[in-house]
Structures are given as C-alpha cells and as structure tokens.
Amino acid sequence: MAVAQELYGFPASKLDSFVAQWLQPTREWKEEVLETVQTVEQFLRQENFREDRGPARDVRVLKVLKVGCFGNGTVLRSTTDVELVVFLSCFHSFQEEAKHHQAVLRLIQKRMYYCQELMDLGLSNLSVTNRVPSSLIFTIQTRETWETITVTVVPAYRALGPSCPSSEVYANLIKANGYPGNFSPSFSELQRNFVKHRPTKLKSLLRLVKHWYQQYVRDKCPRANLPPLYALELLTVYAWEAGTREDANFRLDEGLATVMELLQDHELLCIYWTKHYTLQHPVIEACVRRQLRGQRPIILDPADPTNNVAEGYRWDIVAQRANQCLKQDCCYDNRDSPVPSWRVKRAPDIQVTVQEWGHSDLTFWVNPYEPIKKLKEKIQLSQGYLGLQRLSFQEPGGERQLIRSHCTLAYYGIFCDTHICLLDTISPEIQVFVKNPDGRSHAYAIHPLDYVLNLKQQIEDRQGLRCQEQRLEFQGHILEDWFDFKSYGIQDSVTVILSKTTEGAAPFVPS
C-alpha cells in the first residue's frame, strides 16, 4: 500500500514508528543525493564567472549554503529537491542585488553548459524561474541509481557577518523596499538554523506535518495557490514552543492534532519572533507593527521581518484538509477518543504597559484576543480605582483611539508590546484627547460645563506650556478661555488640536 494511504489509517500511538519506517530517509540514500549535489557546489565555488563588462566583471563565490529540508535536517525519504543559496562578491547591497540578480543568473546558467562534470550527471531542464526571488532550476541524476534530483540555485547578497545581525542590517533591508521575501535568501542561514538546532523529536513532528501536507493537500489540489512548506514549518515550531514550553519529550499525536487545530483557526493566527531583530529600533518597530496590522493569517519570518510567509494563499483549503485529518485514526487514541491537543494561543501574549499621569506605570501580560474588560479588571484589582476607566492608545503617526471594553487588542491590530493610556473619570466627566504639534496626543478628564481655561491649566501642569501660550482648536473653531465645552459641542473622546500662540515658547515636556 502506498505511503500516502497509510497515515490516516495508522494508530495515533504508533506515529513514532510511522515516521521511522516511512519518512526518515536512509543514510545511504541521503549520502548519495548529497554527494551528487556536491558536484554542483564545487562548480559554483571553483568556476570563474568573470565577464568583460557588467556587474559580473569580478564575481567570487563567498559561500554556498544548503537550505530547505536538506539544510535544516527535516528531509523526507521521498524528497529529491535540493536548494542552494550562493553568496556572491558582486553584490554589495540589497539594491545592487535587485539590480543585477537576473544578469548573474543568466551568467551562471550559461557557464553550467560548459561544465563536463555536470553534463556527466545528465544536466537538463536548465531554466530561470519567475518565483520570488527568481532562481536557477535544473535536474541532474545520482551516480549510482540515476535518480533524478531537482536543484534550485539562488544568488544572494551576503548581508550577515559571523555574529548576530545588527539592527542596521534589518533597517537597510526594510529601506530597500523590496517585494516581501525577495531578499530572504540573504538571511537563509538564520532560517536554516532556526530549525536545524531543534530537538530530534520536533524534527519528527515536522516530517509528519510536511508528509501530511504533501500527500493530503498539495497532491490533492495541485493547481491551488497553497502556502509554502516553510509556513507550515514555522507554525509547527510555534505550536511546539507554546504547547510544550520547548520540551524535547512529547507525543507526536498531540503535536499533530495541535497543528491541525491551528490550521483550522488560520484566520486568527498572528505569529512572530524577535530572536534576530529587535523592536527597539524605530525602523524595525514600524515595519513589524505595520505587518502585524495586516490581514491574518500572519506568520512573520523569524529571519526577515518584511516577509509574512502566510500572506496571499488558500488557507481555507488547508483548513478543510486539517479538519479531515482530525477525524482519522492518526488523531484518535486507543479508546476511540480524539487525541488531546496542546493549549496554544492563536497569538502570543504581549506586554501591556498602562500609563496614568501622576502614577507609576502598571505592566500586565495580555493576550490580544482577550476582551479589554479583563484588562480593566486586572487594573481594578491592582489599583482599586473608583471611577470609570478610560483606556486609549496611539500608534506612531496615528491618531489616539479609545479602547472599548467589549473589544480586544486584536480588534485594534495590537499584537506586540504596547503602551496604553489610562484616565480615571467620575461621571459626568468626559475624556478628550489633546493633540500636540508633534502628533502625540494625551487624554484629559473634563466636565462638560468646565471652562476651556480649566483644560489649559491641566495642559500647563503636565506639559509645561503656559496657558497664555496655548491655542486650542476644535473643528475649525478656536476655543475661548471663558466658554464651556458644551457650548462647542465637545463630546466624549473627541480630539482637540493644541498649538502655540507665540514664537519662542517653551518646548513641550516629553511625557
């Protein structure tokens, strides 16, 4: 019976045996494939790619890296696809790579036809693909069994040094403004190591998920625009990290059931890592926050913050197939009960810092899908507020927004650490936002019948700008000191514009 027919009929308790018997490649087969591919690597390292003119006048191969399943140690027995990333000396920036990528591909393609060692291996089907990024793809055959191997070669700019990448490397990547994933090969070593150094048991789970995906999704829907295997790998790693707290000993059936359940909830997924890039850098922070506000599912490449590897694919088809998998023997125990899954949140918890003028900051761990009401309950228990809690937030470059109790942080697109403003009001007080010239806004509590001067005094106390130097404006009307707010039709959570009335006024005090 074909392997593709056996997973669904295999008992959940024996999935370890299934992986060992059907998915784990033999050492002899793997060595034969890698020995054949080594001929390609030697050609790339030793060939002189000089041209009389153009970007390839002096091209040296700095490094050849095996990536994909052969690189990270999760290859399936049936896999005959090998991916190589070639770092070249002629690329000195992401912009140069984008400009000369096609020319270098054509040069390598032309030189391959003159390599006798590759011709002896049956080099054929040599072409340049239009994928992102574009690459050189061809087939060769192993020396002993003459099994056909498909090799993909991607030239790349070597952006990384021997140590961890600096924030400036990622800032330059973001500023290069390439198509998402176009420069990911420059970070392929980080992508490979993200999986390569994981426990053996996790690699077994990765093989199991990839086998399921290949046999029961891709082969059944060959024309559909399905997610890349890399997205499934990252989702599986996240499930293991969150579900077992990175325990090397776990049950494969529980891991498989967990991944299938996550795939069913693909519209809620928002997953990212900050191992290689930090949100402390403003350019990186803006990029990541923008990505996390996108349409879900979101699975950010841990090595490339510009690349949501889950974007634009038919996840609905994958979800349907995952639902079918959960009904099979591989997801049922010996008592004919569904295998329990791990408790894995669809987005990781984030740190929320609650700030209130005149009080110490409060810090809470909150899940983006929890109702805001729960956060307010935590604040209430922490501080014992008597009034009405008014929470608001402001993204860089955006307007301050009121956060409503029945909503979630996810509703506002908040999926990473954030600061929230707290204002405690007592009825009939209302909240107004005062927007400074620099774009930042602050929340103030006012009584609708208070004079405008009362708000100006609060602004002076907090920001240091004297009342006589302030001009407040609402809907095109300048607010006069001795008029009340009700007379201007000012209601709860509206924004009032603050500006200076005289030259040389004291600067705003950062808050």
UniProtKB/Swiss-Prot annotation:
It comes from Mus musculus (Mouse). Belongs to the 2-5A synthase family. InterPro entries: 2-5-oligoAdlate_synth_1_dom2/C, 2-5OAS_C_CS, NT_2-5OAS_ClassI-CCAase, NT_sf, Ubiquitin-like_dom, Ubiquitin-like_domsf. This is 2'-5'-oligoadenylate synthase-like protein 1. Residues 350-429, 430-506 form the Ubiquitin-like domain. PROSITE patterns: 25A_SYNTH_2, 25A_SYNTH_3, UBIQUITIN_2. The keyword ATP-binding does not apply. Specifically interacts with the ligand binding domain of the thyroid receptor (TR). TRIP14 does not require the presence of thyroid hormone for its interaction. Binds MBD1. Induction: By type I interferon (IFN) and viruses. The lineage of its organism: Eukaryota, Metazoa, Chordata, Craniata, Vertebrata. The keyword Repeat applies. GO terms for molecular function: DNA binding; double-stranded RNA binding; nucleotidyltransferase activity. Does not have 2'-5'-OAS activity, but can bind double-stranded RNA. Displays antiviral activity via an alternative antiviral pathway independent of RNase L. Keywords: Antiviral defense, Cytoplasm, Immunity, Innate immunity, Nucleus, Repeat, RNA-binding. It is found in: Nucleus, Nucleolus; Cytoplasm. One of its GO terms (cellular component) is nucleoplasm. Pfam families: OAS1_C, ubiquitin. GO terms for biological process: defense response to virus; innate immune response; interleukin-27-mediated signaling pathway; negative regulation of viral genome replication; positive regulation of RIG-I signaling pathway; response to virus.
